[in-house]
């Protein structure tokens, strides 16, 4: 094609993660991934590993304290830390964190696969077909929406969606720190560094950089700056079935418009390839801890 002469032969498309998100229904690749982050489960591993806490939890619930596989176990853990443990090392602690301020990002809180984590939508990856993770039904073989309401074949007001929003509200009020309901996305997620939260079911990995490294205000690392926390797979809700999407992945990508002059497109394409080159991707991962290439994930910077 017209961009062949300005395409890096070392681009190595097979090295990218998230290509399925930038591939159309026709099988063609329409965008080039530049950055990505996921939404996962976050927890204080150091607290979960304390023998006295593990013993107390098992005595009450009859199973081992660990990464919850479902929302029921997550709620048990939230209730346990908020109402039974209450304080650790003299600090008041809570079993859950979230946000509820009326702001645009509260929309992301729901649309970033929260409904499908509960079990709304159809089976299929990266999106459910014919009903996606937003609960919107699509026309067969296209991205044209038909409807979101159950009466139109959608799922945004179905049992799983209603359950998901109810649990978001219940947990926020019952188990999160005071003031969490008045926080937005940008205040809530980095606030875990204050060190008073045991777990969070809906945590964006884009905020990892704010929770690592030596900083007197960062209470979730040890004396050497190593994280006291870990991430795990998203717990699934009661309506979730095998084959449904679980969790969320965001893939920011380069897109070049046909309407742009071809010479300007070529220049943009050269810059895009520079921005996602293996050396630049590695540097971006060192700083922001977001990954877009397999070679970055497997690099010695992150595998020691």
Regions found by a protein language model. Name each.
Residues 69-73, 179-193:
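Short helix-initiation/N-cap motifs at beta->coil->alpha
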Residues 74, 81, 114-115, 190-195:
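Hydrophobic residues within well-ordered alpha-helices
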Residues 1-15, 28, 51-52, 56, ...:
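Extracytoplasmic "Venus flytrap"/periplasmic binding protein-like
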Residues 91-93, 193-203:
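Alpha-to-beta junction loops
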Residues 185, 202-207, 234-235, 252:
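Beta->alpha turn/N-cap motifs
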Residues 1-42, 228-234:
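Hinge/lid segment of periplasmic solute-binding proteins
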């Amino acid at each position: 094609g017209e961009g062949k002469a300005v395409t890096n032969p070392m681009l190595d498309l097979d090295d990218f993660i998230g290509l399925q998100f930038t591939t159309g229904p026709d099988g063609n690749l329409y965008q080039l991934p530049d950055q990505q982050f996921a939404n996962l489960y976050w927890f204080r591993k150091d607290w979960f590993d304390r023998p006295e806490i593990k013993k107390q939890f098992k005595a009450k619930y009859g199973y081992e304290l660990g990464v919850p596989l479902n929302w029921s176990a997550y709620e048990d853990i939230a209730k346990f830390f908020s109402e039974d443990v209450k304080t650790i090392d003299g600090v008041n602690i809570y079993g859950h964190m979230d946000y509820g301020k009326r702001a645009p990002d509260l929309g992301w809180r729901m649309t970033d696969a929260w409904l499908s984590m509960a079990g709304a939508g159809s089976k299929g990856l990266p999106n459910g077909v014919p009903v996606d993770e937003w609960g919107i039904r699509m026309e067969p073989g296209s991205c044209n929406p038909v409807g979101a309401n159950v009466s139109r074949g959608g799922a945004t007001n179905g049992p799983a969606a209603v359950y998901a929003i109810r649990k978001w509200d219940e947990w926020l009020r019952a188990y999160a720190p005071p003031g969490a309901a008045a926080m937005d996305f940008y205040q809530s997620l980095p606030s875990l560094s204050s060190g008073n939260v045991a777990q969070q079911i809906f945590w964006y990995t884009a905020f990892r950089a704010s929770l690592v490294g030596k900083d007197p205000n960062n209470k979730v690392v040890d004396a050497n700056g190593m994280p006291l926390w870990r991430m795990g797979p998203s717990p699934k809700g009661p309506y979730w079935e095998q084959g449904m999407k679980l969790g969320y992945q965001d893939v920011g990508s380069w897109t070049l418009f046909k309407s742009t002059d071809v010479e300007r497109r070529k220049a943009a394409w050269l810059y895009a390839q520079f921005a996602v080159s293996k050396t630049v991707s590695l540097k971006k991962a060192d700083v922001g801890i977001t990954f877009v290439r397999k070679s970055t994930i497997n690099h010695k910077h992150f595998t020691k």
